Curated annotation (Swiss-Prot):
It comes from Colorado tick fever virus (strain USA/Florio N-7180) (CTFV). It comes from the Viruses. Residues 222-239 have a biased composition (Low complexity). Residues 220-239 are annotated as: Disordered. This is Uncharacterized protein VP8.
Length: 660
């Protein structure tokens, strides 16, 4: 491929510079655009030279078993490459190579010159940084062989052992098994063990000098006494071939790395017993219900009420055991304050199913504490969510200050962008776009909190159909008091006759509801792909001061800021957007007191309640806007003209829904 050849042409001189000079700093460089090497390109050189590099959160490298630490005089072009992308690919290579490849940690012997290439690939930009490292190589084979090592010396070793299912006790068992094979060989191993035991005993009997110091002459005498182990007549060794077969047979026995701890295994066994008892109980209930359906009398109605109560109690027991086995099973639907009143819910549902009394009358006449419990819980929840919004907003402002997007004095990095108009009058307003406000949704699914849905929309965008359906369902759950910012519980559902009745929501949730309604209406505008270029121009007018014939001069540091510090990876945008809309609705859209349209040029004049929070829309748009210039990725943009996309990608569609 052309990109591969160009990246190789730029990468090879830097590699030779390291080989010829021996200076690790000679390899500091940045490749952009089509010249950017892929992780597979980097692995071709890392495998050949014994380098390790980072992909995601894994610091790994496949290394030849007989490969030296580092060789400056080797021609890198003659090595066979094994490109890989993830840790799973390395494992597959290890299996296919029949043990010739050994994935290991990035630690080498002291004094060996080794470089670490960290791949920060983002938007076709790779930055390679190198440093010296020291330590001792530890491979998977050594780990399974059970050699005694100080595991604290190797960073990340415990994490890898946990992910691979390797336990220290299993390693000890493997070591004992290997020792058993050696012991089966006869008296030679016993003689070696006796010599080792004598050495240990001699070390324990070493004389101790004053102030916990040993005298050299005492140590020499003790070592001389321990150097002569008792002579023992070694019996004839067994057949060498038979002993080798025994050793190979035990080494092939892989330790059971998937045995659960005893307490957890007991819980799972108990859960299986509870499930079996529940199934037996359900079968008995089916028989009882059949008898009740045949009787049709008052006594049968009472039996039906008791059956409802029993079923709810058994369900609670089963849920309690499942919760102990997997604490995250209930997820965000787990409500301790409400579950404390489980008996109230059981009684309520039983009476409602029995047809004795309505829910509203039951709460008022029999158990008013049920309604009070809901009111107290929702009131406390509102304060917690508002505090979270404020905290996240302050964190976002601190981040954009620290990252260099702006400063407290009202300066913004976008103010350094120069805009030149080439004497062309701005065209008239864009044509009106058709907006559909139909409400289509999905059914038969568990409710979700608002923040969880926003996280999916911002970080994992999908098609417009799924986005619109998700927003419609979420809006319905908000109207019916099921979903809040952080919770979702279908037992709180209330029936709302009017789709525009927002009385059941608090004021902050009402503002968030308006934001999601706006997003749903914007989805309809994006359905016609022929309008995408016009929508891109509309967004550029609003957030980038674009006009026909406009030229932009964007410094390289601004481009690097947008390329390497994207907000969706640095901040909790799912909390920032609700905060922005609540502040905007409280200010009635007046971000500047004198009525001037707010832009990044007049950031210092914004109202303090929304200052810097509103920059999230400008910064998110500019992250995409700078990629529309033809020369993006090869240096600063000098008097460039954007080329607007004709069809949006899913991520750009999700961004346009939020910004329109």
């Amino acid at each position: 491929m052309r990109a591969d050849r160009q990246s190789t042409a730029k990468l090879r001189p830097s590699l030779h510079a390291v080989i010829q000079t021996g200076n690790l700093n000679a390899f500091n460089f940045t490749v952009e655009g089509v010249d950017c090497p892929t992780p597979a390109d980097l692995s071709r050189y890392c495998v050949a030279n014994g380098w390790f590099f980072k992909i995601g959160n894994q610091v790994i490298i496949p290394v030849l078993r007989n490969f030296p630490a580092f060789n400056y005089n080797t021609d890198i072009g003659r090595f066979t490459s094994f490109p890989f992308e993830t840790l799973e690919d390395v494992t597959k290579l290890h299996d296919l190579a029949n043990g010739d490849l050994v994935p290991h940690f990035a630690f080498v012997e002291d004094g060996s010159p080794v470089v670490a290439a960290i791949c920060d690939r983002h938007d076709n930009v790779v930055t390679l940084r190198f440093r010296d490292s020291g330590g001792r190589i530890i491979t998977v084979e050594e780990l399974l062989a059970g050699e005694q090592r100080d595991l604290n010396l190797y960073q990340g070793l415990d994490q890898l052992a946990d992910e691979a299912g390797i336990r220290p006790e299993d390693i000890d068992q493997a070591a004992l098994a290997a020792q058993a094979v050696a012991d089966a060989g006869g008296g030679v191993a016993q003689q070696q063990a006796a010599a080792a035991a004598a050495g240990v005993q001699a070390q324990e009997d070493l004389p101790v000098g004053r102030e916990d110091e040993l005298r050299p002459e005492d140590v020499a005498d003790a070592r001389g006494q321990a150097a002569a182990p008792p002579q023992a007549q070694a019996p004839a060794p067994p057949d060498a071939a038979l002993q080798r077969q025994r050793e190979q047979a035990i080494l092939r026995q892989v330790p059971n790395l998937h045995v659960l701890p005893q307490p957890r295994q007991q819980l799972i066994d108990r859960l299986a017993q509870v499930r079996e008892a529940e199934q037996k109980f359900i079968n008995e209930m089916i028989q009882e219900v059949g008898v009740i359906e045949q009787q049709r009398d008052v006594a049968a109605a009472g039996m039906r009420l008791e059956l409802c109560r029993s079923v709810h109690r058994v369900d609670g027991i089963l849920r309690a055991y499942q919760e102990r086995v997997n604490p995250f099973r209930l997820g965000l639907n787990y409500r301790p304050p409400i579950l404390l009143e489980e008996e109230i819910r059981v009684e309520e549902n039983a009476r409602r199913l029995g047809g004795e009394i309505g829910l509203h009358d039951f709460e008022i006449a029999e158990r008013p504490e049920r309604a009070l419990l809901h009111a107290e819980y929702l009131g406390n929840l509102m304060h917690v969510e508002q505090e979270k919004l404020l905290t996240t907003g302050r964190t976002f402002v601190a981040h954009i200050h620290q990252a260099g997007y702006c400063n407290p004095e009202g300066w913004c990095c976008l103010q350094d962008v120069e805009v030149q108009v080439q004497g062309i009058e701005p065209e008239s307003l864009l044509p009106a776009l058709a907006v559909r406000t139909n409400c289509r949704g999905l059914v038969l699914r568990a409710p979700l909190p608002i923040i969880r849905v926003l996280t999916q929309i911002i970080h994992h965008p999908s098609g417009l159909d799924r986005l619109e359906a998700t927003l419609n369902v979420l809006l319905t759950d908000m109207r019916e008091r099921v979903s809040t910012l952080t919770t979702a519980d279908s037992t709180r559902r209330i029936r709302v006759n009017d789709a525009h009745d927002l009385a059941a929501m608090t004021a902050p949730l009402g503002h968030v509801y308006a934001m999601l309604s706006r997003w749903r209406d914007n989805v309809a505008r994006l359905r016609a792909s022929a309008q995408h270029q016009l929508i891109a121009q509309e967004l550029a007018r609003k957030y980038a001061e674009w006009r026909p014939g406009q030229h932009y001069t964007i410094p390289g540091r601004v481009l690097n800021l947008f390329a390497n510090r994207q907000l969706r990876y640095q901040s909790q945008l799912e909390w920032v957007y609700p905060h922005l809309w609540i502040a905007d609705r409280n200010l009635a859209g007046a971000w500047i007191l004198n009525g001037v349209v707010p832009t990044y040029r007049n950031l210092g004049e914004w109202v303090p309640d929304i200052a810097f929070i509103g920059l999230v829309q400008f910064l998110e748009f500019w992250e995409e806007f700078v990629t529309w210039f033809p020369h993006y990725g090869v240096g600063p943009i000098n008097r460039g003209v954007p080329v607007f996309p004709t069809v949006f990608s899913p991520r750009m569609s999700s961004l346009a829904v939020r910004l329109l």
